Amino acid sequence: MKAIILAGGHSERFGKAKAFAEIDGQLFYQRIVQTLQETNMFNDIIISTNDQLANQFKHDNVIIDDANNKNKGPLAGIHTVMKQYNDEELFFVISVDTPMVTGKAISALYQFLVSRLIEDQIDIAAYSEHNRVIPTIAFYHPNCINVMDEALASNDYSLRHVYNNVTTECLDVTNIQSPEYWYKNINYQEDLDDLKQQINH
């Protein structure tokens, strides 16, 4: 099973590439890599990014988005990696701007997926908040590839396009009680300031 860290966004709202922002003395991407490694669930951790940022990562496996799908957001990153590893059975996707994700949360979502697979075929198992799917904390099955192809060829290459057209099951974020900020994504510098305050509270 492989993990994909989505780190190719332009981060206009944040002011710089979020992958290299710091929390608790660690860069966001390095913290997530460490969390993923500590789960012992993944045989590979892949950073998905763009050609401008790729050489700034100190990581063994960095994959640049397919040039044909440039500027098509996180879907392009997930699709590029899944196409390269087309014999893999499952991918965990996490956005680099969710630095406090925990191994407990990742493991719980995997257990949720496995328990549902006994009854049904599930293509995406994601977290949700207030019934809103969080597609960047999710497991993706390769069955999604055809719908991803269609989405990238259309004018709607949102992840919503994908999860609405495959079998998606969600686990509410409140199932993981601590820390309460584990799933928060950082869009603005103020979000990072708030997170630091919560951590040090």
Swiss-Prot record:
The keyword GTP-binding appears for this protein: yes
Keywords of this entry: Cytoplasm, GTP-binding, Magnesium, Metal-binding, Molybdenum cofactor biosynthesis, Nucleotide-binding, Transferase
Entry-linked Gene3D superfamilies: Spore Coat Polysaccharide Biosynthesis Protein SpsA, Chain A
GO molecular function: GTP binding; metal ion binding; molybdenum cofactor guanylyltransferase activity
Cellular component annotations (GO), alphabetically ordered: cytoplasm
Cellular localisation: Cytoplasm
Residues at which GTP binds: L6, A7, G8, K18, D65, D97
Broad class of enzyme this protein falls into: transferase
InterPro entries tied to this protein: MobA-like_NTP_Trfase, Molybde_CF_guanTrfase, Nucleotide-diphossugar_trans
Disulphide bonds in the chain: none
BP GO terms, sorted: Mo-molybdopterin cofactor biosynthetic process
Positions bound to Mg(2+): D97
Protein family membership: Belongs to the MobA family.
Domain remarks: The N-terminal domain determines nucleotide recognition and specific binding, while the C-terminal domain determines the specific binding to the target protein.
HAMAP family: MobA
Function, as annotated: Transfers a GMP moiety from GTP to Mo-molybdopterin (Mo-MPT) cofactor (Moco or molybdenum cofactor) to form Mo-molybdopterin guanine dinucleotide (Mo-MGD) cofactor.
Protein name: Probable molybdenum cofactor guanylyltransferase
Species lineage: Bacteria, Bacillati, Bacillota, Bacilli, Bacillales
Gene: mobA
